[in-house]
A protein has these predicted regions:
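Conserved beta-loop-beta connector loops within the AMP-binding
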Residues: 143-170, 204-205, 267-271, 306
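Gly/Ser/Thr-rich phosphate-binding loop
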Residues: 25, 50-55, 64-135, 148, ...
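AMP-binding/adenylate-forming catalytic core of the ANL superfamily
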Residues: 53, 173, 178-179, 199-286, ...
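Active-site glycine-centered loops adjacent to acidic/histidine catalytic or metal-binding residues
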Residues: 84, 108, 141, 173, ...
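Conserved AMP-binding/adenylation subdomain of ANL enzymes
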Residues: 1-4, 12-52, 66
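Acidic/polar alpha-helix N-cap and adjacent early helical turns
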Residues: 314-325
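Conserved AMP-binding
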Residues: 8-13, 85
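Conserved ANL (AMP-binding/adenylate-forming) active-site segment centered on the GW(Y/F)…HTG consensus within
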Residues: 100, 132-137, 157, 162, ...
Length: 325
């Protein structure tokens, strides 16, 4: 009853309607946002006493940028739940170390009703250093009771939980979908495993990390490159407010990554400055070949980056890889 929760995502989104039920069940009050999702509007709504809020990373990137520019703080907020896509480390660090707000990373899908993992600390994590705990917070957490996860290669062979081997992520549980309404056939396999469409690793403690969506993984010269790793590395640059990495056709390597960035309004770093910054966090061969500047990256209705619309936008610009010209 002491909590006031503000779900930022729309109520048609899995996280939106789940909070709409769980908040009153626990006795918490709610702040219901309107259509204006601008950083200024979000800040003003949060200042109505919100203690907990939840949204996708892109929402918090824009809010943090606004807070910094306006020299503002969040007076009542205690916890931020982040899901929908991978959360950049820079967002976690800024919330926790600059504003004293705890970040809770989670993952789920409508097909999972919706929770799949939650990044609460297991006892062994409390003994780790602050840096090691941040590494854990970057994962999407471990599955709750009744949810099972596994990762496999393309041939369906189970992969080890070593935190290093990426594979197709499968989920199974009492609240995991078997078929869509009126579809007529099961979408889960014979053992009730549901293909989430994500690529992930799972470590020995059961903490899962999304490395990409299957459709967004960049395949260059037969090797996989995670667009999420590139995006998180780019957003760590102090002059970059948002980033999206995609693969574009290349005459030799089939695909090569490029990164599209939105910069803070007053600053626009050189391309090599951004690429050199990214190279500190990824292998040399994974560093994007080009940087494209945009005023805005397309988003879906729930605030996630829309790679489909972004590719169309680049096509409309007649963009091709520099080595394909």
């Amino acid at each position: 009853s002491t909590e006031r929760i503000m779900p930022v995502v729309p109520l048609f989104h899995a996280n939106g309607w789940s909070i709409g039920y769980t908040a009153p069940i626990t006795g918490a009050s709610m702040i219901m946002p309107g259509r204006d999702m601008s950083p200024k509007a979000l800040y003003e709504m949060l200042e109505h006493g919100a203690t907990v809020t939840a949204a996708v990373p892109t929402v918090w990137l824009s809010l943090l940028d606004f807070l910094e520019k306006e020299n503002l703080t969040l007076s009542t907020l205690k916890r931020v739940v982040i899901g929908g896509s991978a959360c950049p480390r820079a967002v976690i660090e800024k919330f926790q170390y600059k504003y004293g707000i705890k970040v809770l990373h989670a993952w789920g899908m409508t097909e999972m009703s919706p929770l799949g993992t939650i990044c609460s600390f297991k006892p062994e994590v409390f003994a780790l250093s602050k840096e090691e705990q941040l590494n854990v917070q970057e994962t999407t957490g471990h599955p709750p009771f009744s949810v099972d996860l596994k990762i496999t290669n393309d041939q369906g062979t189970d992969l080890p939980w070593d935190g290093l081997s990426p594979g197709k992520l499968w989920a199974r549980g009492a609240a995991v979908v078997k078929r869509y309404l009126k579809s007529g056939s099961d979408i889960a396999d014979d053992n009730d495993w549901f293909d989430t469409g994500d690529v992930a690793t799972i470590d020995s403690n059961g903490y899962m990390r999304i490395t990409d969506r299957s459709k967004d993984v960049i395949k260059s010269g037969g090797e996989w490159i995670s667009s999420i790793d590139l995006e998180n590395a780019a957003v760590g640059h102090p002059d970059v407010s948002e980033a999206a990495a995609i693969g574009v056709a290349h005459p030799k390597w089939d695909e090569r990554p490029i990164v599209v960035v939105v910069c803070h309004s007053s600053k626009k770093p050189e391309k090599m400055d951004i690429l050199n910054f990214i190279s500190k966090n990824v292998a040399k061969w994974q560093v994007p070949d080009d940087v494209i500047y945009m005023d805005e990256i397309p988003h879906t209705a729930t605030g996630k980056i829309s790679k489909i619309d972004l590719r169309k936008k680049l096509s409309d610009m007649n963009y091709v890889h520099p080595e394909s010209k």
